[in-house]
């Protein structure tokens, strides 16, 4: 569809089964309570398998032992993933100590996983520990509400901007947006926190009785850092400051990376500029975007239900006009803004009020005590003495924020003694993977377990061509749902089958261009052979300051994706 020939505002047809499930769930209650008390299975059955996602959990099993258990006539080893709601990634040291203890005492893997949704996940929670984890979170002022399924997910906010004062203001807006768009149902409190049922009827004035057509992701971003990868998200508020003070936001809508292998109706898409709005209209505009997508999003086909598809179907101007109508405003022209990078600034950075921030590189966000590198113990020891907070970044790293000068040496010593400040090359700092095997049920190929050794080999190629300190934004995602954000990388690997990936090239360093598929269904040796040749050319032929992705486009190695709805698959 073009802007001149927009499609229908509402897609008619038989609703997907997920819509039935939501409608019949009694505002997300289902029969979860009954399932919790069923000791015959380690999992949740029927609709509850999906309903628990609205409560921040996914049912998984250990795929490494799935076949072995099947041979023994045993059900899969079911366990839950829980994702915390943590707007802007800010967590207190008291909260950190509580989650550290829970991970050690009550999860199969004993780890804390930082994610690129700027929060943490527990993997391997047995059914008997599901209620206790929600109660533990509640006891320290946290929850897992609306971190999965068809709601506004965890709201991201730039972690380590150049203006600390601006971060404080932007972070407050991230929290306000998150709270404003939360579901109003009391199901979460009743089921997990044993709060009494109230006689009043549930209402969902913003999300509606069947919630959103699909997942919905929101960011608050402070230029020039695009660390939160705004183009992966449905709704983005780009902070505009005057004299160091936040005055309003540019709004960008309709980003999203998930695709389905071979389904040409799916595509990755960057977000579109709508306009500028003063601060006082922020919540009204956020609500208007969400309710427009609620009413116009495709509820017949979940593969085509995200905001990016709604925007393409009805046309950008039509969607924008509806948001203006609902919010009661007219967007002003976009204010100037520019992004220069999206990696974290590893190491010490000076903030305001003589406070320091220490960004620690955590490979794939996995916090665990490794032989010779007791990362988890180190962070616990820092949490015990640190007077500021921790910030999780959208690059799966951790910031020890607001460290006074008097504590700096002590915290650095703890970090170094526990392997948290080991030297890594720029390539490793700019590489990322989703979890994938063994816990993700959707995984088609390895990602987190594949990345460290693969990065070693890419570093060797950079060294071979005389550019050991260069970096290429590299992402590995275990399936086309794209949690690893490979569709905004300069080198993106998308899992196709065990040991096989689609290789995408042509993204850029700042994350504003979708990469195109260069080779399909290839093995690691084939990938490395291609990269060896292309990185060799980049080292010799690049212009000053030219990133690898920009080089592959300029040199004609790959055609840029300019209009994803039409040319993503070409």
From Swiss-Prot:
<dbReference type="InterPro" id="IPR045169">
    <property type="entry name" value="NO2/SO3_Rdtase_4Fe4S_prot"/>
</dbReference>
<feature type="binding site">
    <location>
        <position position="483"/>
    </location>
    <ligand>
        <name>[4Fe-4S] cluster</name>
    </ligand>
</feature>
<keyword id="KW-0479">Metal-binding</keyword>
<keyword id="KW-0198">Cysteine biosynthesis</keyword>
<keyword id="KW-0560">Oxidoreductase</keyword>
<comment type="similarity">
    <text>Belongs to the nitrite and sulfite reductase 4Fe-4S domain family.</text>
</comment>
<dbReference type="GO" id="GO:0050311">
    <property type="term" value="F:sulfite reductase (ferredoxin) activity"/>
</dbReference>
<comment type="function">
    <text>Component of the sulfite reductase complex that catalyzes the 6-electron reduction of sulfite to sulfide. This is one of several activities required for the biosynthesis of L-cysteine from sulfate.</text>
</comment>
<dbReference type="Pfam" id="PF03460">
    <property type="entry name" value="NIR_SIR_ferr"/>
</dbReference>
<dbReference type="GO" id="GO:0020037">
    <property type="term" value="F:heme binding"/>
</dbReference>
<dbReference type="GO" id="GO:0051539">
    <property type="term" value="F:4 iron, 4 sulfur cluster binding"/>
</dbReference>
<feature type="binding site" description="axial binding residue">
    <location>
        <position position="483"/>
    </location>
    <ligand>
        <name>siroheme</name>
    </ligand>
</feature>
<dbReference type="Pfam" id="PF01077">
    <property type="entry name" value="NIR_SIR"/>
</dbReference>
<keyword id="KW-0411">Iron-sulfur</keyword>
<keyword id="KW-0028">Amino-acid biosynthesis</keyword>
<keyword id="KW-0521">NADP</keyword>
<protein>
    <recommendedName>
        <fullName>Sulfite reductase [NADPH] hemoprotein beta-component</fullName>
        <ecNumber>1.8.1.2</ecNumber>
    </recommendedName>
</protein>
<feature type="binding site">
    <location>
        <position position="440"/>
    </location>
    <ligand>
        <name>[4Fe-4S] cluster</name>
    </ligand>
</feature>
<comment type="subunit">
    <text>Alpha(8)-beta(8). The alpha component is a flavoprotein, the beta component is a hemoprotein.</text>
</comment>
<dbReference type="GO" id="GO:0009337">
    <property type="term" value="C:sulfite reductase complex (NADPH)"/>
</dbReference>
<dbReference type="InterPro" id="IPR011786">
    <property type="entry name" value="CysI"/>
</dbReference>
<dbReference type="GO" id="GO:0000103">
    <property type="term" value="P:sulfate assimilation"/>
</dbReference>
<dbReference type="InterPro" id="IPR005117">
    <property type="entry name" value="NiRdtase/SiRdtase_haem-b_fer"/>
</dbReference>
<dbReference type="InterPro" id="IPR045854">
    <property type="entry name" value="NO2/SO3_Rdtase_4Fe4S_sf"/>
</dbReference>
<dbReference type="GO" id="GO:0019344">
    <property type="term" value="P:cysteine biosynthetic process"/>
</dbReference>
<dbReference type="InterPro" id="IPR006067">
    <property type="entry name" value="NO2/SO3_Rdtase_4Fe4S_dom"/>
</dbReference>
<keyword id="KW-0004">4Fe-4S</keyword>
<dbReference type="GO" id="GO:0046872">
    <property type="term" value="F:metal ion binding"/>
</dbReference>
<feature type="binding site">
    <location>
        <position position="479"/>
    </location>
    <ligand>
        <name>[4Fe-4S] cluster</name>
    </ligand>
</feature>
<comment type="pathway">
    <text>Sulfur metabolism; hydrogen sulfide biosynthesis; hydrogen sulfide from sulfite (NADPH route): step 1/1.</text>
</comment>
<dbReference type="GO" id="GO:0004783">
    <property type="term" value="F:sulfite reductase (NADPH) activity"/>
</dbReference>
<dbReference type="InterPro" id="IPR006066">
    <property type="entry name" value="NO2/SO3_Rdtase_FeS/sirohaem_BS"/>
</dbReference>
<dbReference type="GO" id="GO:0050661">
    <property type="term" value="F:NADP binding"/>
</dbReference>
<dbReference type="InterPro" id="IPR036136">
    <property type="entry name" value="Nit/Sulf_reduc_fer-like_dom_sf"/>
</dbReference>
<keyword id="KW-0408">Iron</keyword>
<feature type="binding site">
    <location>
        <position position="434"/>
    </location>
    <ligand>
        <name>[4Fe-4S] cluster</name>
    </ligand>
</feature>
<dbReference type="GO" id="GO:0070814">
    <property type="term" value="P:hydrogen sulfide biosynthetic process"/>
</dbReference>
<keyword id="KW-0349">Heme</keyword>
């Amino acid at each position: 569809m073009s802007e001149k020939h927009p499609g229908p505002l509402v897609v008619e047809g038989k609703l997907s089964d997920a819509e039935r499930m939501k409608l019949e769930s009694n505002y997300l209650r289902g029969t979860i309570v009954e399932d919790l008390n069923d000791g015959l299975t380690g999992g949740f059955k029927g609709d509850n398998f999906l309903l628990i996602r609205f409560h921040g959990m996914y049912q998984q099993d250990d795929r490494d032992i799935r076949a072995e258990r099947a041979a023994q006539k045993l059900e899969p080893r079911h366990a839950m993933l829980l994702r915390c709601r943590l707007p802007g990634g800010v967590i207190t040291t008291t909260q950190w100590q509580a989650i550290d203890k829970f991970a050690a005492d009550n999860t199969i893997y004993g780890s804390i996983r930082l994610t690129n949704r700027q929060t943490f996940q527990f993997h391997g929670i047995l059914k008997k520990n599901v209620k206790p984890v929600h109660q533990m979170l509640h006891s320290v002022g946290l929850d897992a509400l609306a971190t999965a399924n068809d709601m506004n997910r965890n709201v991201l906010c730039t972690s380590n901007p150049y203006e600390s004062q601006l971060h404080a203001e932007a972070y407050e807006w991230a929290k306000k947006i998150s709270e404003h768009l939360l579901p109003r149902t009391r199901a979460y409190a009743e089921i997990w926190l044993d709060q009494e049922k109230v006689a009043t009827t549930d209402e969902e004035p913003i999300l509606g009785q069947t919630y959103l057509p699909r997942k919905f992701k929101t960011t608050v971003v402070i230029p020039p850092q695009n660390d939160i990868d705004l183009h992966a998200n449905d709704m983005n508020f780009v902070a505009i400051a005057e004299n160091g003070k936040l005055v309003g936001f540019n709004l960008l809508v309709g980003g999203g990376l998930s695709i389905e292998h071979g389904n040409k109706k799916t595509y990755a898409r960057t977000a579109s500029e709508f306009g500028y709005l003063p601060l006082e209209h922020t919540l009204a505009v956020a609500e208007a975007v969400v309710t427009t997508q609620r009413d116009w999003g495709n509820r017949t086909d979940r593969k085509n239900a995200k905001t990016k598809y709604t925007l393409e179907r009805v046309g950008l101007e039509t969607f924008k006009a509806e948001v203006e109508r609902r919010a009661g405003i007219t967007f002003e022209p976009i204010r100037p803004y520019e992004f220069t990078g999206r990696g974290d600034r590893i190491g010490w950075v000076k903030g305001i009020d003589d406070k320091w921030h220490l960004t620690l590189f955590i490979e794939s966000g996995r916090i665990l005590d490794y032989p010779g590198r007791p990362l988890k113990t180190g962070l616990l020891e820092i949490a015990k003495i640190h007077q500021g907070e921790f910030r999780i970044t959208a690059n799966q790293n951790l910031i020890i924020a607001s460290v006074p000068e008097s504590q700096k040496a002590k915290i650095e010593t703890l970090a170094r003694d526990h392997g948290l400040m080991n030297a890594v090359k720029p390539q490793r700092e700019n590489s990322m993977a989703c979890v994938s095997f063994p816990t993700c049920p959707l995984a088609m190929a390895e990602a987190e377990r594949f990345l460290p050794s693969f990065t070693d080999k890419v570093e060797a190629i950079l060294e071979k061509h005389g550019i050991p300190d260069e970096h290429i934004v590299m992402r590995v995602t275990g399936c086309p749902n794209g949690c690893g954000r490979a569709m905004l990388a300069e080198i993106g690997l998308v899992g196709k089958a065990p040991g096989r990936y689609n290789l995408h090239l042509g993204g850029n360093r700042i994350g504003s261009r979708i990469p195109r598929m260069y080779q399909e269904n290839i093995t690691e040796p084939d990938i490395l052979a291609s990269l060896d040749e292309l990185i060799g050319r980049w080292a010799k032929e690049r212009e000053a300051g030219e990133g690898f992705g920009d080089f592959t486009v300029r040199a004609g190695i790959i055609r840029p994706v300019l209009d994803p709805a039409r040319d993503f698959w070409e």
